Amino acid sequence: MKLRKGAKISIVGTGLVGASAAFAIMASGLASDLVLIDINKAKAEGEAMDLGDAAAFVKPLDVYAGSFEDCKDSDIIVFTAGANQKPGETRLDLVYKNVNILKESLPQLLKYCPYAIYLIVANPVDVLTHVALKISGLPSNQVFGSGTVLDTSRFRAELAEYCNVDPRNVHAYILGEHGDSEVAIWSTADVSGIPLKEFFQLRGIPPISREKVVKRVRNAAYEIIQLKGATYYAIAFTIKRICETVLRDENSILTVSGIVNDLYGIQDCCLSLPTIVNGAGREQVLPITLEREEEVALKNSAQILRDVIKQAGL
């Protein structure tokens, strides 16, 4: 699994998320070309200059502010452009603002980058991924969202802390909407192949409070926004991780958001499920077995997203 030679990544939107993602990508050495695009050209230029000053400390990289035309031949387009989520505002409240931004930008990107992988990050990510697929007409492997990859990381971190183990040894998923209706999948959660209940018994750990864990995971972004105004570091690492598995053709299983049909009774809706991600993008969804309550909750999450899409006339 080798890195594509001369990989090019373009980031549309250089707010806190886009700029932090640029930093994470640059530090990782994933790309040889990194293009920053923003409606505020001065902001993009400033971010590019600031990052460029660190050129002596990373692998050779050409980072610069540009236009949509400069995205030509990009391997990945990372779309973070959108209004910020304000305190007390849900991700779904952003739909009207950010759908319009996407509609204005995507046709111009497609003109120069018809073969790129499009990673949608701006919120509400599931709705915007749905819109991007409809507008672009591109195949579903080529357009997908960051989904619940970060939520899954939060879930695993919570379980790891409780179990006092390395988070990388915890396997558990958050599925559905990246937002308030997301679903924690407890039935398949394990620590290095040992089901949680058995692991608790082996280690003499009392049963975990599922409600408290789910609440912390679901409300993490709201709490951070309340404390510091925005979330951007963890999502930056999320973006870097997704780009990494694409550029290195890793066949990693990530809970990215993409179109779902004929699974769990869900039709024509973008949400997150365990998915093989590689050089082709979102290659294959893995339909894991869920308990009845989990499947019902997942269907409910899908219905909430469909209702938003319908209300917005999308």
UniProtKB/Swiss-Prot annotation:
Broadest EC class assigned to this enzyme: oxidoreductase
One GO process term, biological-process aspect: glycolytic process
Activity regulation as described: Allosterically activated by fructose 1,6-bisphosphate (FBP).
Catalytic-site annotation from UniProt: H178 (proton acceptor)
Binding site for NAD(+): V17, D38, K43, G82, A83, V121, A122, N123, S146
Pathway annotation from the record: Fermentation; pyruvate fermentation to lactate; (S)-lactate from pyruvate: step 1/1
Chain positions with Phosphotyrosine modification: Y222
GO function term, MF aspect, one: L-lactate dehydrogenase activity
Keyword entries, A-Z: Allosteric enzyme, Cytoplasm, NAD, Oxidoreductase, Phosphoprotein
Compartment(s) of residence: Cytoplasm
Known EC number: 1.1.1.27
GO cellular component, one term: cytoplasm
Residues at which substrate binds: Q85, R91, N123, P124, V125, D126, D151, T152, S153, R154, T231
SUBUNIT field: Homotetramer.
HAMAP family assigned: Lactate_dehydrog (MF_00488)
Family affiliation: Belongs to the LDH/MDH superfamily. LDH family.
NCBIfam families: L-LDH-NAD, PRK00066.1, PRK06223.1
UniProt function note: Catalyzes the conversion of lactate to pyruvate.
Name the UniProt record assigns to this protein: L-lactate dehydrogenase
